[in-house]
Regions:
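Interdomain hinge and pocket-entrance segments immediately C-terminal to HTH DNA-binding domains
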Residues: 82-93
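A short LG(V/I)-centered, amphipathic sequence patch enriched
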Residues: 40-57
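Short alpha-helical "packing" element that flanks the helix-turn-helix/winged-helix DNA-binding module
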Residues: 8-12, 64
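The N-cap/first-turn positions of alpha helices
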Residues: 2-5, 29, 61
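Helix-turn-helix DNA-binding elements, focusing on the entry/boundary residues of the two helices
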Residues: 17-18, 36, 50
């Protein structure tokens, strides 16, 4: 499991399709499918199920999404620190 897979899960749910998520993330639809399949294998459960022509989250998928969003929020905070100049500055005497 990696951050990219969690971003893909979040994007698929947010945009409602693999195609739109792929466009947003600037990757191919097959990359989306491959990465989600790898995430499902890592977690040992299915994240989506077909409902007619649409994909809907399974109960495990809803839990995974909720936790993924927490991780992505924390990741964003940490990445913002990377560029921050919050270290001590000034003149030493």
């Amino acid at each position: 499991m990696n951050i990219k897979q969690l971003q893909i899960l979040d994007a698929v749910v947010r945009f409602g399709s693999y195609r739109k998520a792929a466009a947003h993330l600037r990757c191919s639809q097959s990359t989306i499918t491959f990465q989600l399949k790898n995430l499902e294998n890592s977690l040992g459960c299915f994240l989506f199920e077909k409902a007619g022509r649409h994909m809907v989250l399974t109960p495990a998928g809803r839990t995974a999404l909720k936790e993924a969003q927490k991780i992505l929020a924390s990741h964003s905070v940490l990445m913002n620190l990377k560029g921050s100049k919050s270290s001590l500055t000034g003149r030493l005497r």
